Design a protein with these regions (language model features):
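Conserved interdomain hinge at the start of the Helicase C-terminal
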Residues: 129-131
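Active-site-proximal helices and loops of the catalytic beta/alpha 8
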Residues: 4-99, 104, 125-126, 135-138, ...
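FAD cofactor-binding and catalytic pocket of flavoenzymes
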Residues: 133, 145
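Short, solvent-exposed helix-loop connector elements
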Residues: 117-122
Length: 167
């Protein structure tokens, strides 16, 4: 995992990714691309048409926009076309912006964000949890489960990073 990938020099990181992958073709570098738009995230993925003629050579980027949509979608109960699971449908129909949607790292939470089960109320909603994990494990991309998510650990980013990383 390459932390804060877009903050580093583009040309250096592109060359670094290419050289590592040339030497170790089965090694995968995941770039933390914490951006709130699929278009912005897709710019950083290897072979992105949005970055042409440049190429980041970064095969796997983190799908932060999907994380946000999942956290909202499984909290909203609506029968209209503006929220709930429609959020996921709408977002996934835009996968054409990615060079390779199957190489996106997908996740419900991580060490920098509030946990999916932010508080005890959300942790007790097992239907919400099961639906979200099922979606995560069956949608396109490479699923990642942050330690503690599987046992419904709680943690709110507003209480500090220590609350997200407790043992």
């Amino acid at each position: 995992r390459q932390d804060t990938h877009p903050y580093a020099d583009y040309d250096f990181m592109s060359r670094w990714c290419k050289e590592v992958n040339d030497e170790y073709p089965y090694f995968n570098i995941v770039g933390e691309t914490w951006l709130n738009s699929n278009v912005l995230v897709s710019f950083w993925q290897k072979d992105s048409k949005l970055a042409a003629p440049r190429n980041s050579n970064l095969k796997t980027v983190m799908d932060f926009p999907l994380m946000e949509h999942m956290n909202k979608a499984f909290d909203e109960e609506t029968s209209d076309w503006s929220g709930g699971l429609y959020r996921l449908y709408d977002y996934l129909t835009q996968d054409l912006v990615y060079a390779d949607p199957m190489n996106l790292l997908t996740f419900l939470d991580n060490h920098d964000t509030s946990r999916f089960t932010t508080n005890d109320e959300k942790a007790q909603n097992l239907t919400r949890f099961k639906q979200a994990v099922t979606f995560l494990l069956t949608t396109r991309g490479i699923p990642q489960i942050y330690y503690g998510t599987e046992i419904l650990m709680t943690g709110d980013k507003s209480e500090g990073d220590g609350m997200l990383r407790k043992d």
